[in-house]
Each structure stands twice: as structure tokens, then as C-alpha cells.
UniProtKB/Swiss-Prot annotation:
Name recorded for this polypeptide: Thymidylate synthase
Gene designation: thyA
Binding residue positions for (6R)-5,10-methylene-5,6,7,8-tetrahydrofolate: D174, S267
Pathway: Pyrimidine metabolism; dTTP biosynthesis
Organism: Corynebacterium aurimucosum (strain ATCC 700975 / DSM 44827 / CIP 107346 / CN-1) (Corynebacterium nigricans)
Function: Catalyzes the reductive methylation of 2'-deoxyuridine-5'-monophosphate (dUMP) to 2'-deoxythymidine-5'-monophosphate (dTMP) while utilizing 5,10-methylenetetrahydrofolate (mTHF) as the methyl donor and reductant in the reaction, yielding dihydrofolate (DHF) as a by-product. This enzymatic reaction provides an intracellular de novo source of dTMP, an essential precursor for DNA biosynthesis.
Amino acid sequence: MATMIETPYEDLLRRVLEEGAPKGDRTGTGTLSLFGAQLRYNLAESFPLLTTKKVYFHGVIGELLWFLRGDSNVKWLQENKVRIWNEWADEDGELGPVYGVQWRSWPTPDGQHIDQIQVALDTLKNNPDSRRNLVSAWNVSELDKMALMPCHLLFQLYVADGKLSMQVYQRSADMFLGVPFNLASYAALTHMFAQQAGLEVGELIWTGGDCHIYNDHIEQVKEQLSRQPREYPQLKLHKAESLFDYDFDDFEVIGYDPHPTIKAQVSV
């Protein structure tokens, strides 16, 4: 008897398509929108890289490594053939104090900076039961300086029985283009934190606020939902010297057999 493949993302995508309320949005494209949803993935069993369409994993890892560099310029991304941030960059490639800057160099009132990622890792090692182990990109005082305000703005780390779980809050969730990318990114980050802290992986829990499908993605969504899901792959993570020393070659996806890519326009 065939094993039932769980499809939390596809189930939510179908819900938004069938139950979403028509809404306007910042980009002028228009959406179907549903407010408040949660997806759960057991990272010990598999890696949540969607199979109902091919997800650009090189781009997922490139962006994540770029965040962990604390970078605000697209130059490093472009050098590594990742162009997903080009639309928002200015003529010099700058984006302002976006995700990576807040993660690695959150400014304090006295002129110092906090490396939230290092603090989070230290907390995992020294106080794993802490309920205060969060990383935020939502710096209210700097939002207006950012080319794009954070969509996935907060994550919390949780340890039980030697397993690390992560919960992510995403205020604005582009269900077709953005969320598949974000799921894989935070799943990879959970593996990295766990490996560096000497823990096993637990769950990735994704919580979405405004979960939406853009009007010009509806046909693509219908095509994706018509496809039969396949087994999720596994992630083999080669250990780096530190959380900040991982490179593209350290991430090996095993058994990834997705349906073909489905093209769609990004709403800027």
C-alpha cells in the first residue's frame, strides 16, 4: 500500500484559491487573500522542498547565505548567479537595512550593534530551554529605509528532547512564488542551527498572516494543484566550521524529483 504524502502547503494553496477574499494590494495586482494559517513539517523525516513544481534551491541557499553575511547589497548574490533581489535594488545594488543587516547587526540606541544570529546560537548551546530565543527583522525605526519591508519577520527556536524546532511568522505570504522558497530556506536554517548546537532537527512550523495568491498567478496555481505530489527529498548538510562558514556545496539535496518549474511574474 502506497504511503500517503502529506501536503500542508498544497492544502493551504487550495484553501486560498477556493475561500480567499478578493483584495487590493500595494503592487496594484490584486489578490485572493486568507488571514491566519499554519503549516507543519517534520524535518527529521524529510526536507520540505516542494515537488508539485521545481523550487530554485540554488537561489534559496544563496539568499540564506547572503542573509547570514549581514549583507545589504545584491552584488554578492549576482556574483553567485542569484538575481531574485534585483528588482528592489537601487542603481548601486543597495537595498537598505534589510533582513541580513537586522539579523547580524541590529543597531542599539547607544550606537552598538547586536548579532542576533550569534546570540540565538549561544542561547541554544547555553540555555536551550529559553523561551526568549527569537530573531526579528522587523526593526520599526528602520522600516522606511528598507527597499522591501520584511515579509517573514520573526522566528523562534525551541528545544525539546534534544531536537530543535523553529517557528516562523510571515506577515505577508505570496503563496505561489514566495512561500515555497521561504519554507525551504527556514528548514535549511533549522538544520544549520541544529548542527552547530549539537542537536537533532525537529519541526518547522510556518505561521502566515495575509496568505494570498496574486490574480496573475491563479492559472499557475491551478496547474500546480492538478499535479500529483511526490516524495519529499532529504537534506544532507556537510558540517562547516561555524554557522557563518557554510557554502553552496555544503547543502546536498537527495532524492529530489519535482514536477517542472511553473513561471510567474513577481509583483514588485
